[in-house]
Every structure is written in structure tokens, then in C-alpha cells.
UniProtKB/Swiss-Prot annotation:
Organism: Enterobacter sp. (strain 638)
Compartments, record wording: Cytoplasm
Annotated keywords: Cytoplasm, Exonuclease, Hydrolase, Nuclease
Described function: Bidirectionally degrades single-stranded DNA into large acid-insoluble oligonucleotides, which are then degraded further into small acid-soluble oligonucleotides.
Subunit structure: Heterooligomer composed of large and small subunits.
EC number(s) on file: 3.1.11.6
Protein name per UniProt: Exodeoxyribonuclease 7 small subunit
HAMAP family: Exonuc_7_S (MF_00337)
Cellular component annotations (GO), alphabetically ordered: cytosol; exodeoxyribonuclease VII complex
Enzyme class: hydrolase
Domain of life: Bacteria
Length: 80
């Protein structure tokens, strides 16, 4: 299996690849070495995705703080 070290083109591409990796790992059909390689790639993609999400959150906070009178409000999702 070729090693994929390149960062995906977008967050969505990384998420799609990560979902495919999870499906392959959950199938239980991979040899141990391949499963470890897939897991390693999955961790790498998850970390890259987290960085992209943090960058997006920072951009949103910057955009919201453009108003001189408004203080930036941290994003907190509604718990349902």
C-alpha cells in the first residue's frame, strides 16, 4: 500500500478519506501491518482536520471582532 503523506486538498477531502479509513479498519479484513498504516494515516488526517477547524474558528472570531464595540464571543455549540 503506498504511503500517503500529502495533505488533502480540503477539510472535506480529509474527512472523506478519514471515513474511508475507518470503514476499512472496521471491516477487520486488513492484515496487521496494513491496519497500522491505515491507523497512522487516520491519526494524521484527524490532526490536520483539527488544525483546519481551529484556523476556521479563529477566522470567525476575527470577523466577528471587526466591530470596534463588540467583544469576540467564543463559539459554543448548543447542547441538545
Amino acid at each position: 500500500m503506498p504511503k500517503k503523506n500529502d495533505a488533502p486538498a480540503s477539510f472535506e477531502t480529509a474527512l472523506n478519506e478519514l471515513e474511508q479509513i475507518v470503514n476499512r479498519l472496521e471491516s477487520g479484513d486488513l492484515p496487521l501491518e496494513d491496519a497500522l498504516n491505515e491507523f497512522e494515516r487516520g491519526v494524521q488526517l484527524a490532526r490536520q482536520g483539527q488544525v483546519k477547524l481551529q484556523q476556521a474558528e479563529q477566522r470567525v472570531q476575527i470577523l466577528l471582532s471587526d466591530s470596534e464595540d463588540a467583544a469576540p464571543t467564543p463559539f459554543t455549540p448548543d447542547a441538545e
